[in-house]
C-alpha cells in the first residue's frame, strides 16, 4: 500500500437506488497512472457477484475482512488538472452488480426437473436390471432343478430302454424259437405223413415176413412130424425120403425167402433212417440259411436306420448351432442397444446442460446490452449537462475528447470482439444443428434396427414354433412306437404261452417217437462235426447281429439324449427370447421419448438463433450510436466534458456532479481502498 495516502479506509452504507459518485485526489507518483484498480462488489440482499472475463495481475488492495473482491479491467487517462476514468464492460458480464431479480430460475428448474426425471428413469432401469438379474438367478436355479429332474428322468429312461432292449432280445429269441417250433411242427406233420407211408410199407413187409416165418414154421413142424414118424417107424421108404428131401428144400426155400425179406426190411429201415437224417439236416440247413438271410436283411435295415438317424442328428446339431448363433447375435444386439441408450442419455444430459449454459449466457448478454444502453443514455444526459458547462471546462474538454476518442477506439475493438463472439456462436449453432442431424440419423438407424430386430424376433418365434411342432410329432411317434412295442410284447407273450402249451402237448405226443430218435442219435453224431461249422458261422452272424443291435440301441439312446438336449435348448431359447423381447420393449419405450426431446432441443436452438439475431441487430444499433458519437466528437471545442458513471447509481440524489476544474482539485480513479459503496 505504498502508493496510497495515509487516510483510513472509508465505508459508505447507502440504499439500493441511491447513485454514488466518488472523487479521489491524484496519486503522487506518475507511475500509478498506468496501474489498474479493481472494484469491490458486495454480495448482500438481492445482489450476487458476476465472473469477469479478463484478469490482470495487479497488487491486491486492502479489503475489509469477510468480503471478496472482483477485478474488472479499467482504463484511466490522467493529467495534472483532470482525470477521466472509463470501465468498459467485460466480454461475458457487462454489469458490475447484478440483482437476483434479473436472474430467472425457470430454465434451471426445468433442467433440474429433467435431470431428476432422468435420474428416476435411470433408477427405474437399474431396479428393472436388478429384477431381471434376480429373475435370471431364479431361472438358473429352476434350470438346475430341471436339469437334475431331467437327469433322473434320463436315468429312468435309460433303465427302461435297457429293459426294453432286454425284452426285445427275449422277444427275438422267443420269435426264433416259435419259428423253429413252427418249422419243426410242419416238419413233424410231413414226417408223420412220410412215416405213415413208410409204416404202411414196413407193415406190408412185416406181414410178408410174418407170413414167410409162419410158412417156415409150418414147414419146420411138418419136418418135425416126418422126422418123428421116421423115428417111430424106423423104416424109411422112398416116398418118405422124397417127402423129407422135398420138405427140406421147401424149408430152405422158405428160410431163404425169409432171409431175403428180412434183409430187404433192414435195408428199407436203414434207407428210411438215412432219409430222415438227410431231410432233417437239409431242413436245419434251410432254416439256418433263412435265419442268415433274415439277419442280413435286418442288418441292412438297421444300417439304413443308423444313416437316417445320423443325418437327423447332424441336422439337429446344425439347427442348434444356428439357434445358438442367433441367440448370441440377439444378446450382442441387446448389449449394443444398452450402450447406445447410455450414450444417448449422456449426450442428452450434456446437451441439456450446454443449452442451459447458453441460455444463461444469452440472458447475461441481454442484461449487458441493457446495461450498455443505460450507460449510453447516461452518457447522452451527461453530454447535455456538459454542453451547458462547456465555457468553463474547455481545456479539460479537449483532454476528455482525446479520452473519448480512445474510448471509441476501445468500443470499436469491443464491437469487433462481439462480432468474433457472434461468429463463434454461429459456429456453435451450426455444430449443434449438425449434432441434431446426427441424432436424427441415429434415431432413424435405431428405428430401422428396431424393425430388423422385430423381424428377427418374428422369424425366431416361427422357428421355435416349427421346432416345437416337430418335437411334438417326434414325441407322438415315439409314444406310438412304444405303445405298439408294448402291444407286440403282450401279444408275443400270449403266443409264447400258447406255443409252450402246444409244445408240451407235442412233447407228450412225441414220447413214442423218442425211441426212434435215440436210434437216430448215433447217426446224427456223425453229422455234428459238419453242423459245428455251421454253428460257428451262425455264432459269428449272431455276434454281428448283437453288435448291430447294440449300435442301434446306442443310436436310439443318443437320439433320446439329443431330443432332451433339444428340449432344454428350446426352453432356454424361449426364455432368452422373452428376456430379449422385454429388454427391446423397454429400450423402445425409452427411445420413443427421443423425438419429443429432440423437438424440445430444436425449439430451444431456434429460440437461441432468434436471440442471436436480436443481438446482432442490437450490435448494429450500438455501432450506429458509436458512429454518431464520433461525428459529435469531430465538433472539437464545442462539446463539453462528461464522465462515465462508476456504478448503477450516483451519490447525492438528483444533484448534478461538480466538475473538477470548478473545485480546484485533481480527480483520480475510484479506489475501493479509500471509498467503498457497500449495501447491507
Curated annotation (Swiss-Prot):
Q: Which gene encodes it?
A: ODF2
Q: What does its PTM field state? A: Tyrosine phosphorylated. Phosphorylated on Ser-90 by TSSK4.
Return the similarity comment. Answer: Belongs to the ODF2 family.
Q: Which InterPro entries match?
A: Odf2-rel
Instruction: Cite the record's note on assembly.
Output: Self-associates. Associates with microtubules and forms a fibrillar structure partially linked to the microtubule network. Interacts via its C-terminus with PLK1. Interacts with ODF1. Interacts with MARK4; the interaction is required for localization of ODF2 to centrioles. Interacts with TSSK4. Interacts with AKNA. Interacts with QRICH2. Interacts with CFAP58. Interacts with BBOF1. Interacts with CCDC38. Interacts with CCDC42.
Q: Can you locate the Glycyl lysine isopeptide (Lys-Gly) (interchain with G-Cter in SUMO2) cross-link?
A: 133
- Using the record's annotations, give every residue carrying the modification Phosphothreonine: 87, 105, 226
- Give the sites modified to Phosphoserine: 68-69, 90, 101, 104, 110, 124, 134, 256, 627
Where's it found, cell-wise? Cytoplasm, Cytoskeleton, Microtubule organizing center, Centrosome; Cell projection, Cilium; Cytoplasm, Cytoskeleton, Microtubule organizing center, Centrosome, Centriole; Cytoplasm, Cytoskeleton, Spindle pole
Q: What does this protein do?
A: Seems to be a major component of sperm tail outer dense fibers (ODF). ODFs are filamentous structures located on the outside of the axoneme in the midpiece and principal piece of the mammalian sperm tail and may help to maintain the passive elastic structures and elastic recoil of the sperm tail. May have a modulating influence on sperm motility. Functions as a general scaffold protein that is specifically localized at the distal/subdistal appendages of mother centrioles. Component of the centrosome matrix required for the localization of PLK1 and NIN to the centrosomes.
A biological process (GO) of this protein is: regulation of cilium assembly
Does the entry feature the keyword Transcription regulation, yes or no? no
Annotated Gene Ontology cellular component terms: centriole; centrosome; cytoplasm; microtubule; sperm flagellum; sperm midpiece; sperm principal piece; spindle pole
Q: Where is this region: Disordered?
A: 27-46, 387-410, 632-680
Q: Which portions of this protein are annotated as coiled-coil regions?
A: 139-212, 275-418, 456-630
Alphabetical keyword list: Cell projection, Cilium, Coiled coil, Cytoplasm, Cytoskeleton, Developmental protein, Differentiation, Flagellum, Isopeptide bond, Microtubule, Phosphoprotein, Spermatogenesis, Ubl conjugation
What this protein is called in its record is Outer dense fiber protein 2
